[in-house]
Regions:
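Surface-exposed amphipathic alpha-helices with a cationic face
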Residues: 93-100, 186
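Conserved donor-binding/catalytic loop of nucleotide-activated donor transferases
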Residues: 240-242, 262-267
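Pol beta-like nucleotidyltransferase catalytic core
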Residues: 24, 265, 269-340
């Protein structure tokens, strides 16, 4: 689909700045884009409340979105592009279609539908639905399309690794059993392997909630965690000076996380709990070590870190780049195969 001069309403959660990169790409392709956050109130602590009380968040969002629609009813759109759409109400989608009867609505889901149960009720409003999760794609007959990495992440391997405290890196939001798995991995590492852990929690009160009500966090210390999302420059520096990345997917999802694709783009090795990764076309056991999230201990040999990363075919980097992702989102004939 040619996006030149197309008017797009882009609705997406604020997620470590990725919404800005997607917006910029759409504009570079010639589209005129208006951005709305998937959460009308999306400060970190508000985001946490959205996860705890999704029905309340949807009602509050609906009021704000309908007000926005009323104030902008003189604007017309060719496309609505939604990522996740957890808090969009049926009324908002209905009124948007009433105001823009010729507009196409596209939905991309980058979470498991088990984690976003309200989205399915809104499928009927969309002309095209894609998912990053292979299981959801099969079950609900959606278009399967994995996530992406940014183009600048594909250059992070250019500088050779020297002495670094960031040999093995974890960057991500702490949820479910992630903290426990990270601690188990730390204990299994060879003595000469160092780590840098950027464990993000939305707000200090969320940490205390976990610590009081979840036994996994009984020995957790507040200073272990970061309460602000990581800045892109720090992220790039950490990846540049590491040789491997820890990836722990949510227990309810099978789709590859953003961190997995970032590591692929940066040509870094991956230690992951997602066994489904072996079904993808870029899988190489030299580059990727699969571990069980339920094991009490692991064996991670030094050789995994010292052996050279084996590059994959250049066509795969193009396929999993943000350019390839956007092209597939708006393509009318996506026939790519991402699995072996």
């Amino acid at each position: 689909m040619n996006l030149k001069e197309k008017k797009i309403l882009f609705i997406c959660p604020r997620f470590f700045g990725y919404e800005k990169f997607i917006l910029e790409k759409l504009q570079l392709m010639g589209a005129s884009v208006i951005f709305l956050s998937d959460r009308a109130f999306d400060k970190p602590w508000q985001s946490a409340l959205t996860k705890l009380f999704p029905s309340i968040a949807t009602k509050l969002n609906s009021i704000l979105y309908l007000k926005w629609l009323k104030n902008n009813n003189n604007k017309s759109f060719d496309l609505m592009f939604v990522i996740n759409g957890q808090t969009l109400s049926k009324q908002f989608l209905y009124e948007f279609k009433e105001l823009n009867p010729h507009a196409k609505l596209i939905l991309y889901i980058w979470d498991s539908l088990k984690n976003k149960t309200t989205i399915q009720k809104k499928f009927k409003f969309f002309d095209r639905i894609l998912s990053f999760d292979p299981n959801d794609s099969k079950k609900y007959k959606l278009i399967f399309r994995p996530l992406f990495f940014l183009n600048n992440q594909n250059n992070l391997n250019k500088k050779s690794l020297k002495k670094s405290s960031n040999y093995l890196v974890f960057i991500g939001t702490i949820h479910s059993d992630r903290y426990k798995v990270i601690k188990t991995i730390e204990k299994a590492l060879p003595s000469n392997v160092k780590t840098f852990l950027y464990m993000h929690i939305q707000a200090p009160w969320v940490f205390w909630y976990y610590k009081i009500f979840n036994n996994m966090y009984r020995n957790a210390v507040k200073k272990e965690f970061n309460f602000l999302p990581i800045e892109q420059k720090l992220f790039e520096n950490l990846y540049r000076n590491s040789c491997a990345v820890i990836d722990i997917e949510h227990p309810l999802q099978k789709g590859l996380t953003m961190r997995t694709l970032e590591a692929l783009g940066a040509q870094k090795k991956i230690i992951t709990t997602n066994s489904d990764i072996k079904n993808y076309d870029f899988y190489n056991p030299n580059n990727i070590k699969i571990i069980s999230r339920t094991a009490k201990d692991y064996t991670i040999n030094t050789s995994f870190f010292t052996t050279k990363y084996q590059e994959i075919d250049s066509s795969l980097y193009k396929k999993y780049s943000i350019d390839g992702w956007i092209k597939d989102i708006f393509s009318t004939d996506l026939m790519k195969d991402f699995c072996r």
